[in-house]
A protein has these predicted regions:
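Short S/T/G/P-rich N-terminal loop/turn motif that feeds into the first structured element of a domain
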Residues: 1-68, 83, 106-166
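Tryptophan-centric aromatic hotspots in well-structured domains and transmembrane helices
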Residues: 74-75
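An amphipathic, aromatic/His-enriched active-site/gating alpha helix that lines ligand/cofactor pockets
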Residues: 78-108
């Protein structure tokens, strides 16, 4: 008989741990090319080891037809994640996606060890099936108190200014 080993992660050294899932879904050939373009750029950015990024996992396949791919990241704390999102190259990707969606939908879901969960879905009404939290929870516009991830997580402090204004 094979002995089974059972472990768990000791997260006591990570009191502010953040886990974020990110994904894009192509709705057109142009969207497929956008997916192919962003992959190497993300790999280059995470290989630069941004401060606070503990681990990056890619190649989560939600579907092949239509292409819907994602990744998961572990961050030391929300401030580190927020700082990275307000700098290049992430800031440029976000501005570009908001200005020119290029036939893709994007979503992310953020989970805090302290208990908060937040999400944002761009062009989610174009999804054939509603991903993640939208599969069971109603959607609301990301405005006002729901505009930034910091606000959606109900974290204290001003944080960094958003990449785009409301």
């Amino acid at each position: 008989m094979i002995a089974i080993s059972r472990q768990t992660a000791d997260l006591s050294g990570y009191p502010d741990l953040i886990v974020i899932y990110l994904a894009m879904k192509a709705h057109s050939l142009r969207g497929f090319w956008a997916l192919l373009k962003i992959g190497p750029a993300i790999k280059k950015a995470v290989n630069a080891q941004p401060d606070g990024l503990l681990h990056h996992e890619e190649n989560i396949v939600y579907s092949l037809f239509p292409p819907h791919f994602g990744m998961r990241q572990y961050w030391r704390d929300f401030d580190s994640l927020e700082k990275w999102t307000r700098e290049m190259p992430h800031m440029g990707w976000w501005k570009d996606l908001l200005a020119r969606p290029q036939g893709v939908s994007f979503w992310h879901e953020t989970y805090s060890i302290r208990g908060g969960i937040e999400s944002v879905f761009l062009a989610s009404r174009d999804f054939d099936s509603r991903p993640g939290l939208l599969a069971f929870a109603p959607d609301v516009d990301a405005k006002g108190s729901m505009f930034s991830a910091r606000r959606r997580l109900q974290l204290q402090g001003e944080g960094r200014p958003p990449v785009v204004s409301e």
